[in-house]
A protein has these predicted regions:
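Single conserved hydrophobic/aromatic residue that forms the stacking wall/gate
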Residues: 1-11, 178-186
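Conserved nucleotide-binding/hydrolysis modules and their immediate coupling elements
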Residues: 4-5, 9-79, 84
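Secondary-structure transition/capping motifs at alpha-helix termini
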Residues: 42-44, 69-72, 105-113, 133-136, ...
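Hydrophobic alpha-helical scaffolding
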Residues: 27-31, 54, 64-67, 71, ...
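Active/ligand-binding-proximal structured segments within catalytic/core domains
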Residues: 28-41, 72-127
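Short beta-alpha junctions and helix-cap segments that line functional grooves
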Residues: 50-53, 63-66, 112-114, 168-173
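Non-catalytic interaction/regulatory segments
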Residues: 120, 124-180
Length: 186
């Protein structure tokens, strides 16, 4: 995936990393437990390897190692995301949702997500539960998740209001990320 973007701001830090802010970006910044994209930002004058993507307020910061050339402000650039890594992250993102639902199905609706880490190689899901999960329940949870994966259901994206999503059965996991008063609405 390659998109041309205008280079906004470039910052060089003491750690030899280059911090790039673009006017727009296809890179996903770390958020909600999901790690940020990596890839390449380049043009005919330079190449920079994006080693991490972070949010800082309203800005997306591309943390890069300069491979070659020099970067100047207001250059047009091409952005290339590591699409294989992103695909693996998407798979583990979906698996987090499957695991969360399986935990609710086996242990009860009191289970809520307290945090997560979505990485290309693994995932971690932190949940609230008053006791240790026994081996029998772990086996049942595994079976539910594996059966759902085996169904090979296509993933569909539908952008809608929080209210409409809740009417269709969506679960708001981190209420305050949706709206400031979303917790009162659940």
């Amino acid at each position: 995936w390659t998109l041309s973007r205008g280079l906004g701001d470039v910052y060089k830090r003491q750690d030899d990393k280059v911090y790039i802010v673009l006017d727009n970006t296809p890179f996903y910044a770390e958020s909600g437990g999901q790690i940020g994209d990596i890839g390449v930002i380049e043009n005919k004058d330079f190449s920079a390897k994006v080693v991490d993507t972070q949010k800082n307020g309203d800005f997306i910061i591309h943390i890069c190692s300069l491979v070659s050339g020099n970067i100047l402000e207001n250059m047009n650039v091409s952005c290339k995301i590591d699409s294989i890594r992103r695909k693996d992250i998407k798979i583990n993102h979906s698996a987090t949702h499957l695991l969360h639902q399986a935990l609710k199905d086996v242990l009860g609706n009191h289970i809520n997500q307290a945090g997560s880490l979505v990485h290309p190689d693994y995932l971690r899901l932190d949940v609230t539960h008053p006791s240790k999960i026994d081996t029998k329940d772990i086996t049942a949870i595994e079976l539910l998740v594996n059966n759902k994966i085996a169904e090979n259901i296509s993933v569909e994206t539908d952008i809608q209001s929080l209210e409409d999503a809740k009417k269709e059965g969506a679960t708001a996991l981190f209420c305050l990320l949706y709206t400031s008063d979303a917790a009162d609405e659940l």
